[in-house]
Amino acid sequence: MAFHKLVKNSAYYSRFQTKFKRRRQGKTDYYARKRLITQAKNKYNAPKYRLVVRFTNRDIITQMVTSEINGDKIFAAAYSHELRAYGINHGLTNWAAAYATGLLLARRVLAKLGLDKTFTGVEEPNGEYTLTEAAETEDGERRPFKAILDVGLARTSTGARVFGVMKGASDGGIFIPHSENRFPGYDIETEELDTEVLKKYIYGGHVAEYMETLADDDEERYKSQFVKYIEDDVEADSLEELYAEAHKQIRADPFRKYVSDAPKKSKEEWKAESLKYKKAKLSREERKARVEAKIKQLLAEQDE
């Protein structure tokens, strides 16, 4: 097949259509988003809620979002750094923290709607695959609050942390349509879920196992990797109890605020902190002087 060079003439540019900004930036999958937000045409004023999950290097962001013409509206949000208020101070981006963050969001959403007593979810997680069902009330049968998982551009591989958030929100009392084939412990060949493996991940058992293995094999690396755990006397044996207690506290008060012992920084201090890493813009004279200095340096090196 002959090679045809793409001619970018005036006609090409006049007819060129730019893609959406967030597509150009690689932030939004509009093919998926269209299907997530499109509502049935025979429903009016019935918002379609999405459980939005995003991961950063140090945090997990979970939001309950609905889409409107003017833009997305956030009904409630929960972040993994808020887990410090419930005793979880380390490993705020692991699978167990993802589960706890999902649970925190679910309890907040239901508390705001006044449904937290009607839909309690799974109070003691055992790794079983469950979906939130309708509850019997004095006024008759009440359907649960429904949301759809929105993972953005994250990989949906088996055992991914996004499904930890989903499991936490599901156990928290929200109905999220899903199957068991993406949880840790699911065997593709037998098509069965090992509930013990999933339970281990919920309570941070995989972290505890790694801590014990590393402590035996490479003590120096263990001390450097888990230095914060060691400083706070958090041992591998105590992790399960720590997460179980955090789950109880989240259910008791999902709106608890974390109060840090460190003194609060003023606006001036934060500004000075940010300016520390920001390079000052050089003036024309400074740029010219810098170029002249480099030329002199090069000439001196050549003479040598």
Curated annotation (Swiss-Prot):
<dbReference type="Pfam" id="PF14204">
    <property type="entry name" value="Ribosomal_L18_c"/>
</dbReference>
<dbReference type="InterPro" id="IPR025607">
    <property type="entry name" value="Ribosomal_uL18_C_euk"/>
</dbReference>
<comment type="subunit">
    <text>Component of a hexameric 5S RNP precursor complex, composed of 5S RNA, RRS1, RPF2, RPL5, RPL11 and SYO1; this complex acts as a precursor for ribosome assembly.</text>
</comment>
<comment type="function">
    <text>Component of the ribosome, a large ribonucleoprotein complex responsible for the synthesis of proteins in the cell. The small ribosomal subunit (SSU) binds messenger RNAs (mRNAs) and translates the encoded message by selecting cognate aminoacyl-transfer RNA (tRNA) molecules. The large subunit (LSU) contains the ribosomal catalytic site termed the peptidyl transferase center (PTC), which catalyzes the formation of peptide bonds, thereby polymerizing the amino acids delivered by tRNAs into a polypeptide chain.</text>
</comment>
<dbReference type="InterPro" id="IPR005485">
    <property type="entry name" value="Rbsml_uL18_euk"/>
</dbReference>
<keyword id="KW-0687">Ribonucleoprotein</keyword>
<dbReference type="GO" id="GO:0003735">
    <property type="term" value="F:structural constituent of ribosome"/>
</dbReference>
<dbReference type="GO" id="GO:0008097">
    <property type="term" value="F:5S rRNA binding"/>
</dbReference>
<dbReference type="GO" id="GO:0022625">
    <property type="term" value="C:cytosolic large ribosomal subunit"/>
</dbReference>
<keyword id="KW-0689">Ribosomal protein</keyword>
<dbReference type="GO" id="GO:0000027">
    <property type="term" value="P:ribosomal large subunit assembly"/>
</dbReference>
<keyword id="KW-0963">Cytoplasm</keyword>
<dbReference type="GO" id="GO:0006412">
    <property type="term" value="P:translation"/>
</dbReference>
<dbReference type="Pfam" id="PF17144">
    <property type="entry name" value="Ribosomal_L5e"/>
</dbReference>
<protein>
    <recommendedName>
        <fullName>Large ribosomal subunit protein uL18</fullName>
    </recommendedName>
</protein>
<comment type="similarity">
    <text>Belongs to the universal ribosomal protein uL18 family.</text>
</comment>
